Amino acid sequence: MASANVAEVDLAVIGAGLAGCSLIGRLNQLGSDLNIALIEAGRGPGGRTATRKRRDQSGWLLNHGAPGFGLSESMPEGMKALLAPLRSAGVLQRDERAVVSLNAQGDLSPANSPEACPVGGWWHGLPSMASICEALLSAAGSVELSRQFETRVRWLKRRQGHWLLENEDRTWSLRAKHLVLSGTLLAHPRSLKMLAWNDVPLRSAVDEGVDCSLDAVLSLLQRSQAEVRWNLMVDLGVLALNGEQLPAQIWLDNDAKKRWKVERLVLQPQSDGRWGLVVHGLDSGEAITPESQGRLMAQEQQRLVELLPELVQGLPVVSAALSQATPLGVMRWGASRPLNHPLPAELQWCPTSAVGFCGDWIEGPGFGRAEGAISSGVNLAERLHADR
């Protein structure tokens, strides 16, 4: 049972990805005086734009999720205002390196698919993708912000006009007047299998019939699906480059995806001359549970490592480095991209229960992309601020 002496905030935001951090960053810009707590299961901010560090190698930064994203030429004013300081500070920059396509024969050619070549080009964070979320959170402003990392919220309760959040063993808890979920895990049935939970936390917190807007959100999420990715991380060491430029990304065409069950490869230079490689592996469809996860991680690492010689045969300098390469494990992204049933924007905030939602799963032109995550956070921030 939670202690009676529980910290209380105006707003609890669960998830420190692009959406949650954009929400907080925009509230800051608007001069909000909210007392906010940010709760994140990972070690730091970033979500699917997170960056993996290594305890044994200082300076190693590997973007093991999204290596960058596209931005529309015309964005809403609030989104422009949010990103302008990041651009001027050099944290958000265009990635001018080449993006190429790989066919099923192992040949490389310039990429031309819409997913590999977003309109307006690729933008990335410097020195790493996680720098974007870090900058959004660190911007000076009026918001009072506390951060709680490496904490997975398991239990939600709605009582007496407040939310109570608790971790699995209830050793940590927090009270909040308002709640925002920037991901779907606590509201989606996938948590039942993936985490062996016996309930969907948000559904258990508010009985059906109490809040018709929230009922609509949860009903829609029951039908929504997302892609799973298994991302292999590799230290390639120092490459014997003789002035040649390596591509930033290698996207597999449809036939190559079918052959190798891989979406793309990402090459990332390190500050000490080494190179990192991330292979974005497609999912086999086998159920992910606490019992199967360890076996599936090992299985995917072995599968992707064994594919490397075929995948990089068109880059001799990378191929030659495989003998010295060190696999660094696999990152499983349980919901790397939503596929269907976007949440209508009018359901982003449910005032009866004081709960809101943001993320790339919100309906709009950016659905399924980083731009959608950012814009959903901005839109929700502006609504919350206007309602104060």
Annotate each PLM feature.
Residues 9, 44, 51-52, 272-388:
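Conserved flavin/dinucleotide-binding core of flavoenzymes
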Residues 12, 26-56:
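Glycine-rich FAD pyrophosphate-binding loop
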Residues 149-163:
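A conserved short coil-to-beta-strand element within the FAD-binding core of flavoproteins
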Residues 227-290, 307-315:
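Active-site substrate-recognition segment that forms the wall
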Residues 173-247:
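Central helical "cap/lid" subdomain
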Residues 47-101:
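N-terminal FAD cofactor-binding segment of flavoenzymes
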Residues 7-9, 169-178:
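Core beta-strand elements of the Rossmann-like FAD/NAD(P) dinucleotide-binding domain
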Residues 68-76, 114-138, 148, 293-300:
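Short beta-strand to alpha-helix junction loop
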